[in-house]
Amino acid sequence: RIEMITIYGKPRCPFCDRAKALCEQKGLEYEYKMLDADYTAEELFEKVPNAKTFPQIFIDDNPIGGYTDLEKLHG
């Protein structure tokens, strides 16, 4: 089964870029959402009330954390 990864990022975010690069290197299917273009901060806080850093990454709609959490799972 292919898991769906969603990366909620923002402009000028090195760890957002690293998360996308990791997905591409590993051949993982992902969707990238950009702050203000694709979602608002309020919408993100509804999904992850204690989000403090970017990116916020979800696998199959479940929040897993940030880049280092993705790297632990797929690095």
Label the predicted regions.
Residues 34-51:
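Thioredoxin-like thiol-disulfide oxidoreductase module
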Residues 48-58, 67-68:
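Structural micro-motif
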Residues 30-32, 63:
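Conserved beta-strand scaffold positions in the cores of enzyme catalytic domains, especially
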Residues 14, 39, 65:
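Short alpha-helical
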Residues 59-75:
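Non-catalytic, surface beta->alpha helical segment in thiol-disulfide oxidoreductase systems
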Residues 2-28:
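Local sequence-structure signature of Cys/Sec-based thiol-disulfide redox active-site neighborhoods
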